[in-house]
């Protein structure tokens, strides 16, 4: 099984929160992994996503739970892009262009997403009004449960970066009660720490050229395409039948999808050849069948 080294310069964090001897290697998903993905549902999304990612990683001098959430998302994007050929992007539908009123459908590839790299590695913020120093951290996989609560809540989002033993809600209340300048300073410091995949995509209308900003909701629930066990087994059986290949659970899934494309082309070519033979046979049959006008009837 091949593993690819992830360079720190490619990570949203630039590796600034990992030791210099840390090494992250990743492989694509196998048939076994995609079968496990078939058990995916909303209630177990985080658990299965974490288990699949952990299976596909080789870590040196780094614990899985200490991976930054921004880097986790990058690694999941890598996994999706390099595992799946047919569903490596997101389908965007805009009901109505604001200019020409045309509906827009476009597939956005994952490599179209812009990465916001870390600007500052701050681990404290001094609040002058309270005369205290607030310890800060970058959220990691350990904080994933809390991170699920912060969507559309600015205070909970900021609270995620405070490194104390208080609950997320207690940290949020502390932030809400800060005086103006202390709040501004804390928010500015944390905003400069933030990094990750930029979720706003510019979509161009094919009719009038109008550019529309679309914000994608990217979460564990929609990170991967869910294929049923029945579909997986049917695909493997089909490849075995037409390509005479024995696909095991250790096969990289991307190779299975490539074989599927080859088999589909084989079937298409065979069908086209069959249609040609049928057409040829009909043509020959018609050539040997005398027309009614040329048949001489005996006189009575």
Model-derived features: where do they sit?
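Short acidic DE-rich linear segments
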Residues: 283-300
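An amphipathic, hydrophobic-aromatic interaction surface with interspersed Lys/Arg
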Residues: 1-92, 96-280
